Regions:
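Conserved, well-ordered alpha-helix/loop/beta-strand core segments that scaffold catalytic motifs
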Residues: 1-15
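Beta-lactam-recognizing serine transpeptidase/beta-lactamase-like catalytic domain environment
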Residues: 15-18, 22-62, 67-265
Length: 265
């Protein structure tokens, strides 16, 4: 219902949403609009049959700024206390590539760059990073790979091999461009931040019982640990600051600890 309300309010052509338990990978809710009634499916066009949460990949925008943020700490770039000049909102990355921020900033720390979602600040940060570190972190998060859900329509997203990256790719991928992800991939990435750094396999079925006899129970088994719990706690606090003081203030719920990141796909 909330998804439908959002579609009506924004007049969007489509929308999808997913809720995952970050400790188990269980998919608690999943929705895609437009949808259809299976009792009279023949009255709908093929576009309504898609579960966009798993079948559609898109450029995730600033939600992927977790990549340079985590990279800076995971690979010990020692830039946590540095400040970066954000060019007051406009910056020529190359003679043909220009970056703009949604609001002008002077100099910001890496934490404030993330909180205020500065594209220019991100470009300055990744300029000090190894291309392979950013690529490897994308791989570790599972981008470019199917999650293993039992649906033939699942998309693997799009992550080009490192040999096909240009000189500006590490900047554009770090601001969520030149890469395609599905919403389930992105949800699992943020779940890893919430659970101590573990990428989990998603589950749509928790158990199956027949005549009170259990014939199937899903097993919670991490695919890999991407980073340690200490780094996870640090990122969670920064995500909370995004909601409390940054671009996601509208997500602030009194009485609840909420963390998040805005992004324009």
């Amino acid at each position: 219902e909330e998804l439908k309300n959002a579609v009506n309010m924004t007049q969007a052509e489509s929308a999808n949403g997913i809720i995952i338990d970050p400790n188990t990978g269980d998919i608690l809710a999943i929705a895609s609009i437009p949808d259809f009634n299976p009792n009279n499916y023949y009255n709908y066009n093929l576009n309504s049959y898609k579960n966009r949460t798993i079948s559609d990949s898109y450029e995730p925008g600033s939600t992927l700024k977790i990549i340079p943020l985590i990279s800076s700490m995971k690979y010990n770039y020692d830039i946590e206390n540095k400040k970066y000049f954000c060019e007051n909102g406009s910056y020529n990355l190359t003679h043909i590539n220009k970056l703009n921020d949604h609001e002008p900033h002077d100099s910001l720390s890496i934490k404030d760059i993330f909180i205020h979602s500065s594209n220019i600040g991100i470009s300055k940060i990744v300029n000090e990073m190894n291309l392979k570190d950013i690529y490897q972190l994308c791989l570790n998060f599972g981008f470019g790979t199917k999650t293993g859900l039992p649906f033939k329509s699942e998309s693997s997203g799009k992550l080009r091999s490192l040999s096909n990256w240009s000189k500006t790719s590490k900047t554009y991928i770090s601001i969520g461009q030149e890469i395609g992800v599905t919403n389930v991939q992105l949800a699992l990435a943020y779940a890893a931040i919430a659970n101590g750094g573990f990428l989990l396999k998603p589950h749509i079925i928790k158990s199956i019982n027949n005549n009170h006899k259990n014939i199937y129970s899903r097993k919670v088994a991490p695919i890999r640990q991407i980073f340690n719990s200490s780094l996870s706690d640090t990122i969670l606090n920064i995500l909370k600051d995004v909601v409390d003081n940054g671009t996601a203030k509208n997500l602030n719920l009194n009485g609840y600890n909420v963390g998040g990141k805005t992004g324009t796909a």
